[in-house]
Amino acid sequence: MTDKEGQEVKDAPSIEQYTALKDQLTQQILKKQELDSKLSKLEDSIYEKENEYFNESVYGNIVKGFQNFTKTNTGGLNKRRITYTDDDHIFSLSSVNYIKTIMKRQGVNSNGGRNEDLDDYEDSIDPNNGNAGGNTPNTTGTNNQSASQANSNSNQSTPGRKRKIRTIDD
């Protein structure tokens, strides 16, 4: 397209560019959800391994020390179990996400007094058809849509943010 002076003018963003960007966003959201799921499973695995370590180390461990190691036990009657709290899980507590999860499970507000936590929102997409939040506008060219109609349709197909339903397992 050229203007009055014969210089080339760049086209305004087209439906094809919008669709390509929307598809790219959808793929990135799916990838983020997959990585979040893997991270959550890994953090749970680390927590379980810490519990196993605490339970199998009768004579002490690196966190609480080895005081029981040097003491001689009389027939195992004085074997004292060391009690562990969430504060002893030093590897789990090194993860910011895991700390937020624990705080949410305990009902503690972790967002500095704000009413809403932005982590409670998630990007919504339909992974079955790759559609981000709704129907895509008709791009076949057979319908003659005005710009305002295309804009109203594009608002529906933009990925939305919805509040997550929190459960104990989250």
UniProtKB/Swiss-Prot annotation:
Keyword set includes DNA damage: yes
Primary location recorded for the protein, binned into one broad class: nucleus
BP GO terms, sorted: chromatin organization; DNA repair
Residue stretches of biased makeup (Low complexity): 127-157
Stretch list, region Disordered: 107-170
Pfam families reported for this sequence: NuA4 (PF09340)
Cell compartments where the protein resides: Nucleus
Coiled coil residues, start to end: 14-53
Protein's UniProt name: Chromatin modification-related protein EAF6
Entry function: Component of the NuA4 histone acetyltransferase complex which is involved in transcriptional activation of selected genes principally by acetylation of nucleosomal histone H4 and H2A. The NuA4 complex is also involved in DNA repair.
Keywords: Chromatin regulator, Coiled coil, DNA damage, DNA repair, Nucleus, Transcription, Transcription regulation
GO terms for cellular component: histone acetyltransferase complex; nucleus
Basic residues composition bias: residue spans: 160-170
Family of the protein in this entry: Belongs to the EAF6 family.
Assembly information from the UniProt record: Component of the NuA4 histone acetyltransferase complex.
InterPro entries: Eaf6 (IPR015418)
